[in-house]
Amino acid sequence: MKKILLLLVLIVAVLNFGKTIVTTINPYYLIVSQLLGDTASVKLLVPPGANPHLFSLKPSDAKTLEEADLIVANGLGLEPYLEKYREKTVFVSDFIPALLLIDDNPHIWLDPFFLKYYIVPGLYQVLIEKFPEKQSEIKQKAEEIVSGLDTVIRDSFKALLPYTGKTVVMAHPSFTYFFKEFGLELITLSSGHEHSTSFSTIKEILRKKEQIVALFREPQQPAEILSSLEKELRMKSFVLDPLGVNGEKTIVELLRKNLSVIQEALK
């Protein structure tokens, strides 16, 4: 009887490890990998250094999606190439109440409150349905992530509270949700990846010159994009990383790294 039970356990383990979860962007790869451990094969579609707004499928990418048992995607227009794979795709943005979303801004993974209350719990539910025999382990990992997020939230409030009501300028609106949560106004040079800076935006920046406390860009953007503003505002720009191009191992580590950059910029 014991041999039969052991055989059944081994069969279930083999079947599960044979399952493939594909995540479109690195932040969800970090979360799903931490939740599942070695329970399944977790693959990343868009490399961290690539621009997910401009990503298009190569034949090898299409093959990866075809072979996936589950696809974890952001939604909010970030992955238009997933239309034919919708039946096996979970869009993380569906976990978040529509009233909390800002227009079509897709950068929900950078909001630690969204992660704590919607994204991690939502992915936990999806994964325990896929791997019910691993519920205990997945729950433990989810609790570890939430505990880390609590620390990030606490540290962010402590660091940013003195700057409530101040203004931050970014080249791209990736940290819109984050700065809103902690009471700072964000002005972006463009509303998306393919829009140039409008004259009205420049006027707003100059009008709020005395309120601006930091300038940021992303790793994929050239330093020159903020050079004129650096001169005008007499302020150095810093790099915030929305995707984890420097090899962060967890989503909490990614948020912590960005918080440390923000703190450095505010000194």
UniProtKB/Swiss-Prot annotation:
Role, per record: Part of an ATP-binding cassette (ABC) transport system involved in metal import. Binds a metal with high affinity and specificity and delivers it to the membrane permease for translocation into the cytoplasm.
Keyword check for Transport: yes
Family matches, as InterPro entries: Bact_metal-bind_prot9 (IPR050492), ZnuA-like (IPR006127)
Main location: periplasm
A GO cellular component entry from the record: periplasmic space
Protein name: Putative metal-binding protein TM_0123
GO biological process: metal ion transport
SUPFAM superfamilies, per the entry: Helical backbone' metal receptor
Native species: Thermotoga maritima (strain ATCC 43589 / DSM 3109 / JCM 10099 / NBRC 100826 / MSB8)
Localization, UniProt: Periplasm
Signal peptide: 1-15
UniProt GO molecular function: metal ion binding
Binding site for a divalent metal cation: H53, H107, H172
The keyword Signal is assigned to this record: yes
UniProt-listed Gene3D superfamilies: Nitrogenase molybdenum iron protein domain
